[in-house]
Amino acid sequence: ALMVASLHKYGHYIIDLKPANVSIYKKTMTVAMFDCDGFSIQGEQARFPAEFVSEEYIYPEGMAQSCEDMGEEQDKFALAVIIFKLLNNGIHPFSGVAKKNADSALSIQERIEQYHYAYGMWGDSYQAPHPYSIHEFLPQSTMKLFDRAFVKGQKRPTAAEWQAELDFLLKNLKHCKKNPNHAYFTNKGCGL
């Protein structure tokens, strides 16, 4: 989130932001971005647009745009997807279990386009949360940011807001008494 916020401060956008383009080096905890041809760079005279964007990370409003026209909203959405997956067992925020009344199976990108986000305060008519989801154990403040990121008509959190929330989560991380290798975020307990 810090890297994304820093780039946004200078008017640059990642656009093709996805886990495969991010690496963390264990020894130094340095974060590196790869495959940077998906960036949109603001030059002194002109913008050098992105050339690529990846499905499952494209914001709903961006489906009608070319990646050359995408900007900060694309990065805000993709960053929220990555953070959701990191905090929720690798589950994509638009994946879930289709309800019995669902007419057909939709791809993740189709679910994004139709705002089928099952993990929010209001649930979803198309799908229920994935059975291995642990979203209910996340703090309310984190869930509110996810709702803002994925519910239609909301103002998506900035990278700086995510940075502050992740700092909050790290500072409030609790260790499980039953398993020293396990940690959790809220007073709801760890589930073990």
Predicted regions and their residues:
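Terminal C-lobe "cap" of eukaryotic-type protein kinase domains
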Residues: 148-174
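Activation segment/activation loop of eukaryotic-type protein kinase catalytic domains
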Residues: 20-62
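Conserved C-lobe activation region of Hanks-type protein kinase-like domains
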Residues: 74, 83-143
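Catalytic-loop of the protein kinase fold
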Residues: 4, 8-26
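Conserved end of the kinase activation segment
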Residues: 62-73
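Regulatory extensions appended to serine/threonine kinase catalytic cores
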Residues: 164-167, 171-192
